[in-house]
């Protein structure tokens, strides 16, 4: 391990942690692996070309030794990730304890900037009252590690900070033994999934993050928000501006296994987790509030609750708060029982709360009484956190969005029309579709008949909407609030969904006016769809019927923007600029029609799917596009990295809130030069499309990446492609990006950029100067270049050339790889030129350090992957080769800390 990289005194603890974990891992290898494997791993830690070292050593290794070496390299990547995460948290705590104010991206710093920007208390309160920030957890299959492996990692992470606190050799030895034990368990556990995840597995994984992290992190963050705002702006209240949402169990786009049953299962699991949390907190409150009427006064509201208590113990006769809490717990658990949850209550069960608001009202009675009668500290502790939790989580824990492809909605509408004796929907043009749909939406008459046998697809789709209605009735109106139309291209796509909502009781029509219980959310994903977003929405806003629908939903229209497909379609530069332009146009359009806009950003973890630091990404949005309303998807490895630990979760959620408020209250920013950006986009698009439409490109991609092996990794419940893979457009964005990361090209995040800059700046120094100026001062262009810089720092063209050698057509591969290699050279040169630096990551010491530590093991894993892919292509039925490819895919993903 290259610990000389950690020569900054601030990194001394990281160096010590890394060395400590490294020694534990070598202890394990000495016991479990052959001397040749141990020696090879030692050589890798100091090698300048670990892939070449692997190529030299591999012929000497048998299958078991190859397996052990692969696993060891992956484990080194894991422990370095853990050491870095612990160090980041350590530095944050040191920063806070030193009283240096908030770091960039913290609420403390954002509040300071608001104050410095002359924002007054009234404007801040107004903005808080109109702010809604949601991190939406999705089941996108990008987490390569099993939950079992993640659990081992969390245990090591929890133990590692103790190393600094060990005051003697015995304490250090005990810690060493604990970590050695965990590493042994990790070594002897299968790294890969043997079976494909089911939707229910994904639901369980998603739910697990709440007791692990969110139930602790959100109340703490709200308490910090209250402190920061009230310190700067006395009297300012913090409403429920931050929530967690989800797709897991409701997203059926491309996933035939999501059904009404999985939706119901999801909410039962949600409710089970949140009611267990409430029961635990109420039990703790019961123990913490033995206040006696001999010592304190009590408000009449609490006395009334106490009088209805099922807690009849004589010892409680003078303890009204405990008796009231027993009553509240019995009613809350009564609701849990009514929802079919199998959990008990030591006080028995009383009449269930009809809503989370009723539960909340009773808790607030306790709080008010404590404050009124001299017990404010008790009111502002656990009880305040529980009140906030109930307000945020309700009975449903997190709302789930529904999502389906526009074409699937249209298929259901067509069948309903057919059986009702109406027009042939599929033969109608767009204008005729709108007319027919509006006609059916203008009155109460349903099209569906229970006496007709419909296709499996139609029954399946209508069942999900019907189940969503029942869930809203049982778990609360906020349980399901959005229905997203993926691949939305026309106004009829929105009206078709509206008709399905009407057919299933989620949208009612009274006196010709609609009232919806759910938001209709178009998702614009491709370059063409993004360019057409404004015309589609303007058509909708001109409809009196839709205007009335929006009125029933608070006059807010949510728009989802897809980063993944637009990037796959047009490349990173063009995708970024099209998204920016779409937002600019939508801001003006919504102003024109006086509709409030909420943007939902469908970002992945990788730059090729819209990823990158959230703080910079939000601040880079066009002025007026945030306005306090934002939703962002979080998936797979991003959920693990950001939210699996309460401290990490609090910090990352704080960043989302801070950036949203800063972008909303201090939105004064200059848009990039549209003419310059459009020219950059046009040329970049041209070169990107030339590559991916080359007749030999698809074969090159399939043969020189582990795309087909990724499909067998059992990462998620849905298929890797929507249909048989013959074209790039048929491939899902996640495996597309995942594969380019594995072969170390990261092509979707930079291809075309270099040629665009070179073309525009040729003999035009003023254009180069303009681009450099944008690189220094424009948030949009800065974020684009920063993301590109991070990706190019992980790109290794030499390793990528080894993958090119896997092609079955060397002459054709030479041409395609030649195009890629030349574009990489141009793009790297252009990036350095615009950043006016001679090396990548010069100003990002943290990432540079991180990569330098992991690169020996990462490159070794790539070397192993190429060798095993070569063997697997020759011997397709070789189980050892396939397992090794799977292990290297896991290891490379961990080393890069990204998948798709």
Swiss-Prot record:
GO terms for cellular component: cytosol. Its cofactor is Mg(2+). Its EC number is 4.1.1.31. One of its GO terms (molecular function) is phosphoenolpyruvate carboxylase activity. Keywords: Carbon dioxide fixation, Lyase, Magnesium. This is Phosphoenolpyruvate carboxylase. Forms oxaloacetate, a four-carbon dicarboxylic acid source for the tricarboxylic acid cycle. Coiled coil: none annotated. It is an enzyme of class 4 (lyase). Transmembrane segments: none annotated. NCBIfam families: PRK00009.1. GO terms for biological process: carbon fixation; oxaloacetate metabolic process; tricarboxylic acid cycle. Belongs to the PEPCase type 1 family. The gene is ppc. Pfam families: PEPcase. InterPro entries: PEP_COase, PEP_COase_bac/pln-type, PEP_COase_Lys_AS, PEPCASE_His_AS, Pyrv/PenolPyrv_kinase-like_dom. It catalyses: oxaloacetate + phosphate = phosphoenolpyruvate + hydrogencarbonate. It comes from Neisseria meningitidis serogroup B (strain ATCC BAA-335 / MC58). The active site is at 140, 568. It comes from the Bacteria.
